[in-house]
From Swiss-Prot:
GO molecular function per UniProt: ATP binding; glutamate-tRNA ligase activity; tRNA binding; zinc ion binding
UniProt organism field: Trichodesmium erythraeum (strain IMS101)
Designated name of the protein: Glutamate--tRNA ligase
Gene: gltX
Residue numbers spanned by region Disordered: 488-747
Basic and acidic residues composition bias: residue spans: 488-502
Positions of the UniProt region annotated as Glutamyl-tRNA synthetase: 1-480
Amino acid sequence: MSVRVRLAPSPTGNLHIGTARTAVFNWLFARNQKGKFILRIEDTDQERSRPEYTDNILEGLSWLGLEWDEGPFYQCQRYELYQKATQSLLDKGLAYRCYCTAAELEEMREAQKARKEAPRYDNRHRNLTDLEKKAFEAEGRQAVIRFRIDDDQIITWNDMVRGKVTWKGSDLGGDMVISRAAGGDEVGQPLYNMAVVVDDMDMEITHVIRGEDHIANTAKQILLYEALGGKIPEFGHTPLILNKEGRKLSKRDGVTSISDFQELGFTPEALANYMCLLGWTPPDATEEIFTLAQAGQNFSFERVNKAGAKFDWDKLDWISSQYLHNLPVKQLTDKLIPIWQKAGYELDPEGDRSWLEQLVTLIRPSLTRLTDAVEMSELFFFPTVELNEDAKTQMQNEDSVKSINSILEIINADAPLLVADVKQTIKKVTQKVHVKKGVVMRSLRASLTGAMQGPDLIESWLLLHQKGFDILRFKKSIGQEIEDTKIEDTKKAETTPHKSKGEGNVLLKTTTPKSPALSKEQTQTTKPPKKGQTATPVATTPTATDVTENTSVGTQETQSQITTPVATTPTATDVTENTSVGTQETQSQITTPVATTPTATDVTENTSVETQETQSQITTPVATTPTATDVTENTSVETQETQSQITTPVATTPTATDVTENTSVGTQETQSQITTPVATTPTATDVTENTSVETQETQSQITTPVATTSTATDVTENTSVETQETQSQITTPVATTPTATDAETREQKVATQVETSILDDQKPVDTVTNQTVEVEQPNKIKEQFINIFFNFPDYINQLYQQYQGQLKLFGWLALVILTFTFMAVVIEALDGIPILSIIFELIGVIYLVWFVYRYLLKRSNRQELLDKIENIKREIFGKPS
């Protein structure tokens, strides 16, 4: 006899993924055994069954490629067959009429619950007399028909998936209802178990393949097969499909119906392929991509798993991508056209066919689901695109604007564009504008796609050029006006959800011209500081010669700005000095000005300090004081604050001498750092000294400028400048004072330094010598390591003494948990373990408990163990130094 399997869904909802997986296994088994696959619609529940659900089930099975050989059969058309079978059971005395009301049954269940018994029917109406039946009918009660199930019955079958399965009659809940209530001698509507058995017998079903949640029904149905005299089929109960928490997948988990997966963009081939793997392992476990026909050739229930199968969305997406990447372009285009149309994209399936296939070729390698094409191809269906922030930043570059302008001059909107033309155009632009190829490519991507990432750039340009969209986007990206033009090829539907991407029928017209592009130098150095940043100007002092120095001060801030102008004073000559310093920062910068004082000769000292910071900025200007000659001093201080304030520095007073001394102090801190550049003092010779100090800080740094002082004698006076900080930073200046001679001993320099430090009320710091002190670092590390190793047992002992109670409690809890866990495993495996093996396991547990108590829990033994460790250490390492 040939194999006959069936799928029997109930039309109370759309085709569920679990029902579809059951259909796949039935179909595969039938094809493997050269049998028949029969479809039966179990619609006996007329209150919940709907025709639209029936249609959804049939359409879903056809969409998956699960064509049935016979059917569909409808149970609602087979009532007469069920009534005859039920009446035969009544005639044989295997079934009876039960007149219990719903209230009586509920009262019975509550009583059983109070006695902590499993709810079941107590068979109270199994042996009613005719007189009792007439009395119930006289009360107007209608009787259901129940099938007798004796408690002492044993039901056993060999399951194709689970092996031998045994049920007791006492576990089936008492006599089961097989027909709904009806008056008199009528037989009511059949219930599930009765209708299923009658249909399977009538259709000669040989194998019943369904989910494991039907195992209890199988025991009841086997009793009905025997009572009706039918041949019992073989049963196979497949594992359930679980959600990520390990529970049965249900409607509460969201996407569960086949129509939902279809809406999400999965192809039927990919979904059917994945459902094969939900509980079944192919002979070659590494071969995960196959058709239903290929799976049917290898299918067997020996490779169906017993454990539930978790639904893995990542695995499904991967399988879907494999199918889409290998699908021919024409077939994939046919599948994507309705998806584009549903998204509101205007296209001509016939006239645009060639262009659409080029688009499919471009996006196919990136597709995971069919619906991904909506977002991926959006930029190709509209004349213009909006630039994101990265693209806008790219197009603010002067080289980008020049590149796009050059492309507009070269490209011909009416001529076809080929790959060779694109490459030649890019080469010409790089030579003409003198920019790197990367700049041109980034500019093209930003203007054409509105983003800095996307599909292949050249292929995208070719597609956009065919629609005439490339010229429009080039012009818009650099701020040129776009004339109102009717778009013939593509227009935006009024109902499209993508209105923000641009109009469909009329090109956007930009009336606001784009800001002129900054020069390359400006784009590299002029960046506004962020919140809480202040730029610090640098003041310079001219020499006593006819020199004109122009400096500009520019401070740009985002939120908090502090601008302090610098007062400059010319020397005794006709000198004009304009001071302005530009400080430009990216995130947070602090520029520390250094004031320089010229000597009485042709000496020029230039000191520049560049400081880059990450977060905060403080600007501290420095004022300089000229010598005792014709001096004009103009000082103006303007302070603009938004959030924070900065204290103005202190200027020092020079005397009229030919010697200049510059004092600067550098203090470095771990978190809050204050960096002060160090100024050197030139002698009265023709010397030019250039000093630059660069300080990089991590969180918040403040650079404190130091004013220089000229003396009238060979004595130099050092003055420290104190700057108030924004957060918590202090600058401690330390000056070094050289004498007017060329030779000076180290002791004299140190003495001078100490004296200067005392005058400044600061700690002396030796900034003169660069001597290196050699330290035997390896020996120190070795000694430190040995000390740590020798003290480790003491540390452990102290830790144990401190937390002795907690550690003991934790140890006992862990021991109890491990013991009970182990004992549970042993008890569970008692059937398969010989008694001798159990004894050895118990001995092992007892020894483990004794060992822990003997060596780890008792204080005396623990101290003994520590003493032994100490002795071993002394023998190996000797006494610690």
